[in-house]
């Protein structure tokens, strides 16, 4: 298969094997005990929504496979502070090295600079990465349904929750949503970007939202670029957003966030 997701996953399997060779799983399992206390990720989003506000997961992202380098002047700690000041509920930090120019250190720098819960945004395919995320200080991990079989999805989500983390289970179509709902994670992300082609359509969320049970927190991801996009979602009853690129392209990301979501 030549699609982008398969290319990323093949490389990720190699990366996990290399990391495991450098630092055994047993070391990580011991290190979890001294990881920083978990900050409630879902709780922070729910609090914003309950207050009538948009719940924004603001992304700390230097580059992407489709756009190349998005933010050349990339300082994760400064970005995190700016986001918190701008009204973000949570952060999402890219740690994938090969395709997004991310780094584990970026997550630590961002989290240390603010009080917000942080999602480790990566392609999780192995229990090793779940322990790794918690050791780094992550409060939530991403599980992409298109990247996992049902057994992996169940096992990895259960492990993450047993370590105190929240899980954002990401889907792109109805078949993936049906699989995601077999997992008791309280949060479903609908990615408007097709990870096989990287094409974006906000209609993806609008078409699928009614199939998401009310007891799951629905997050719309990708393609939220202007106030009209926010209004479209909020009018449809969707109040949680994951946004990155729109903020990374402005000098003060937090001000970009405030303008997009909170400027009356």
Swiss-Prot record:
Record key words, sorted: Amino-acid biosynthesis, Aromatic amino acid biosynthesis, Decarboxylase, Lyase, Tryptophan biosynthesis
Residues annotated as signal peptide: none
GO MF annotations, alphabetized: indole-3-glycerol-phosphate synthase activity; phosphoribosylanthranilate isomerase activity
Top-level taxon: Bacteria
Swiss-Prot/TrEMBL GO biological process terms: L-tryptophan biosynthetic process
Pathway(s) where this gene product acts: Amino-acid biosynthesis; L-tryptophan biosynthesis; L-tryptophan from chorismate: step 4/5
InterPro entries tied to this protein: Aldolase_TIM, Indole-3-glycerol_P_synth, Indole-3-glycerol_P_synth_dom, Indole-3-GlycerolPSynthase_CS, RibuloseP-bd_barrel
Reaction it catalyzes: 1-(2-carboxyphenylamino)-1-deoxy-D-ribulose 5-phosphate + H(+) = (1S,2R)-1-C-(indol-3-yl)glycerol 3-phosphate + CO2 + H2O
Gene3D superfamilies: Aldolase class I
Enzyme Commission number, as recorded: 4.1.1.48
Family: Belongs to the TrpC family.
This protein's name: Indole-3-glycerol phosphate synthase
Gene: trpC
